[in-house]
Amino acid sequence: MIRYFTAGESHGPALSAIIDGIPAGVAITKEDIDRELRRRQQGYGRGGRMKIEQDSAEVLSGIRFGKTIGSPIALVIRNRDWENWTDKMAQFSSNEETTEKISIPRPGHADLAGRLKYGFNDIRPVIDRSSARETAARVAAGSLARTFLRQLGIEIGSRVASIGSAEDTGSEGPLRSLLEHGAETLSEAADRSEVRMIGEAAGIEAMASIDRAKEQGDTLGGVIEIFITGVPVGLGSYVQHDRRLDSQLAAAVMAVQAIKGVEIGPAFDNARKPGSEVHDAFTLMKGEGVRRPTNRSGGLEGSMSSGEVIHIRAAMKPISSLQSPLQSFNLDTLEPVLSRFERSDTCAVPAAGVVIEAVVAPVIANALLEKLGGDHMDEIRERLERYREALRSAFTG
């Protein structure tokens, strides 16, 4: 089973991750990790922090001569901004009493609940750990599972469907065409847009919306679509709640900062339609097995993969740090005041797509390993091919 933990604060010396359970024999390069870190830093509407950081992972263990060795993989990503925060975020110092304390919580953030929960007299520890800066470590961790899946013919990609009121509604045809070549082909096309939209006109409208929001001291959220191609039938299970693949994917997506909604396929649209217009009919294709002319189930039936493209939609709320602050109060004096502003982005929807790609990768990898078992890449590859052949054979004759 693949599992990982992250550590580190936004303005501390570094972020780190320990990833356990990656099988031995997975060929991986440092560029496989750093490429995803660069993708996470891109996107129209990002803040000044992205001009400071140039994220790159240091691998401390678990990889030898370009291949995983089955032991835990430890990664470190240095925070270049740390040099500006050595006093405020010092691990060992006698300056605590003279360091400025933050006592005004920002609406929409973890500030208030976090300070009350952990009994701090300063909101800074909450801000620095709850920050989306932590997702850099998750992207690095997810890149390992993603590389493992890629070498088995399973690809993960995403695109931005909307930012604010700007919707990329005319890209369904190009989307299907791109997915026929694999989900990463879709991501490559999306990455050519600063807002990761497929439609050029929608992208221009989205950037204009971000510009207006920035001028007004406001922020924007949006909707991201994630696609996973090459997943065989039968990953996940219906027999216990914690083995349901849709619930595992939803949990991973909802654990990303600022994600407030998730659906598998067009779930909320399906809820408004009769069943005859929702469920995907079967077509038996000779030599290919079962196919569906539609995929309104989002590639999951009975909480298991159906063999179609897995399709997830995620809603990201607008970023909570506003240059035009909302009403708040001082926790120390209880006096009403306007909220404070912490350096942030105007819009991080494009980057959120990259993060979600990363967090769903271990979920799919674990479902695959649960089905196939195996400790070495060659063993797993052989078992997967035998399973795929068995699926093909079930519908021949």
UniProtKB/Swiss-Prot annotation:
InterPro entries: Chorismate_synth, Chorismate_synth_AroC_sf, Chorismate_synthase_CS
Transmembrane segments: none
Keyword tRNA-binding tagged: no
Top-level class of the enzyme under EC nomenclature: lyase
Residues at which NADP(+) binds: 40, 46
GO function terms (MF aspect): chorismate synthase activity; FMN binding
Pathway: Metabolic intermediate biosynthesis; chorismate biosynthesis; chorismate from D-erythrose 4-phosphate and phosphoenolpyruvate: step 7/7
One example of a Gene Ontology biological process annotation: chorismate biosynthetic process
Names of the cofactor(s): FMNH2
Pfam family, one: Chorismate_synt
Subunit structure: Homotetramer.
Family matches, as PANTHER family: CHORISMATE SYNTHASE
Protein's recorded name: Chorismate synthase
Record organism: Chlorobium luteolum (strain DSM 273 / BCRC 81028 / 2530)
Gene name as annotated: aroC
